[in-house]
């Protein structure tokens, strides 16, 4: 595996992790908001 390909795969992995954290935070906040409004 070439270094550039390895860097590309790592950037994809980190991008997926960041998106997952953002999505998880949005879902968590929306769930809490719904409970508080009721």
From Swiss-Prot:
Transmembrane segments: 8-28
Role, per record: Involved in the binding and/or turnover of quinones at the Q(B) site of photosystem II (PSII). PSII is a light-driven water plastoquinone oxidoreductase, using light energy to abstract electrons from H(2)O, generating a proton gradient subsequently used for ATP formation.
HAMAP family: PSII_PsbX_1
Stretches of the chain forming a coiled coil according to its record: none
Source organism, top-level taxon: Bacteria
Gene name as annotated: psbX1
Matching InterPro entries: PSII_PsbX (IPR009518), PSII_PsbX_type_1_subfam (IPR023431)
Name of the featured protein: Photosystem II reaction center protein X 1
Membrane disposition: Single-pass membrane protein
Similarity remark: Belongs to the PsbX family. Type 1 subfamily.
Gene Ontology terms describing biological process: photosynthesis
Alphabetical UniProt keywords: Membrane, Photosynthesis, Photosystem II, Thylakoid, Transmembrane, Transmembrane helix
Subcellular locations according to the entry: Cellular thylakoid membrane
One GO term describing the cellular component: plasma membrane-derived thylakoid membrane
Assembly behavior: PSII is composed of 1 copy each of membrane proteins PsbA, PsbB, PsbC, PsbD, PsbE, PsbF, PsbH, PsbI, PsbJ, PsbK, PsbL, PsbM, PsbT, PsbX, PsbY, PsbZ, Psb30/Ycf12, peripheral proteins PsbO, CyanoQ (PsbQ), PsbU, PsbV and a large number of cofactors. It forms dimeric complexes.
A Pfam family it matches: PsbX
Keyword S-adenosyl-L-methionine (UniProt): no
């Amino acid at each position: 595996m070439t270094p550039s390909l390895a860097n590309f795969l790592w950037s994809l992995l980190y991008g997926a992790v960041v998106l997952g954290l953002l999505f998880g935070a949005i879902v968590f906040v929306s769930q809490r908001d719904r409970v508080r409004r009721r």
